[in-house]
């Protein structure tokens, strides 16, 4: 089961480095502030996360200078946790919120932080290589309505179909 989850992640992100024209990565990104556990509050649906609740992502520094990624979610249908372990590296330098992430071999996809609470790193708006990939991450299982509204507005302005957002159940 885990192997299928990893393969799906990789196939869908295979060779997808780039970002929507309307999306620009944050500058002055501070990796040490970004490390740790994040809760997925909202996302656009994809087969590799379909049906998952209680989704989290955890980021840690790797020995090679990259970032280890551990995505985890619960499948109610199967009554089990699914995990995907990956690695990420900066594309343009460590102060730019633009990374490439891989969950399978040499295949990488874009991970673009386009909005961020710069003071506390309490939330992040993240895009993939195109407007089909979008996430709202938070240090807490839920966010204030104002942050959610900002996420929806900024995402809509950048061409994401916010009517298709899935709000992740976190317990």
Swiss-Prot record:
Chief subcellular location: membrane
Single GO biological process annotation from the record: response to stress
S-diacylglycerol cysteine lipid modification positions: 16
Any single Gene Ontology cellular-component annotation: cell outer membrane
Topology term for the membrane: Lipid-anchor
Lipid attachment residues per UniProt (N-palmitoyl cysteine): 16
Signal peptide residue numbers: 1-15
SUPFAM superfamilies found in the cross-reference section: Lipocalins
CDD domains: lipocalin_Blc-like (cd19438)
Keywords linked to the UniProt accession: Cell outer membrane, Lipid-binding, Lipoprotein, Membrane, Palmitate, Signal
Keyword Signal recorded: yes
GO molecular function: lipid binding
Disulfide cross-links: none
InterPro entries: Calycin, Lipocalin_ApoD, Lipocalin_bac, Lipocalin_Blc-like_dom, Lipocalin_CS, Lipocln_cytosolic_FA-bd_dom
Annotated localization: Cell outer membrane
UniProt family annotation: Belongs to the calycin superfamily. Lipocalin family.
Record text on subunit structure and interactions: Homodimer.
Protein purpose: Involved in the storage or transport of lipids necessary for membrane maintenance under stressful conditions. Displays a binding preference for lysophospholipids.
Name of the protein in its database record: Outer membrane lipoprotein Blc
